[in-house]
Amino acid sequence: GQIRRQRQMCIRDSFSNGDIDGFDFQWGGRLYGVGDYSYQNIKKTQRQKMTIGGEEVVEIDINASYLTILHGISGYPLPKRDDLYAIGGYNRTVVKAWITATIGHHGFHSRWPKNAIQEIKDAGIDKPAELTMGLLQPVILDHFPMLADWPSQKVTWADLMFTESEIIIGTMLELMHSYGIACFSVHDSIIVRKSDQQIAMETLKDQFFRRTGIEPRLKVN
């Protein structure tokens, strides 16, 4: 007969900035799988081999999650393209690396951080040496003007992560309580059975809109 190995799964809710005055569990808040064998730690292609109740799964991603949230809370409409990072003229991985590095920082970088360089290298891209953070900055800000005052904004990466986490947790709870649907989180994406894809996407969009006033672009893997 067929033998299936099962593991008990635990998740923890991890908050940030606990040593800052005014902390009240309002920063961070991502769900993390506990242990080295968490489904969150394996490649997306491996997660596609998961099953829920013996059924194939799909992973539903929020495109440019933090950037989309920032559009919503800043009152800017989303650009009319499926991928926010595809601004034209520049590789989307380089654009994403610039935005990720900036949003994760308190201001604008004067040079590429090591993790951004590694992200670009891992994608197999040879970034031109002359393409500095400073050179790319006006191009990015022209497409995403809400980032122009990022160094002085009160909103930080921890606020964006909390909003994203509330959206994901709200989606999981609604799917469970209203529809009896099992759902696993991977930070800015959710995993559900293939047969639950449509209702899961509708629920995720609704939860996102409730908290940001904007509807996200979703991608299904």
Give the residues covered by each predicted segment.
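Polymerase palm active-site segment centered on the conserved acidic dipeptide of motif C
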Residues: 197-221
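Catalytic phosphate/metal-binding cores of nucleic-acid and nucleotide-processing enzymes, i.e., regions
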Residues: 1, 60, 176, 190
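Single conserved hydrophobic/aromatic residue that forms the stacking wall/gate
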Residues: 1-13
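Active-site palm subdomain of RNA-directed nucleic acid polymerases
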Residues: 166-186
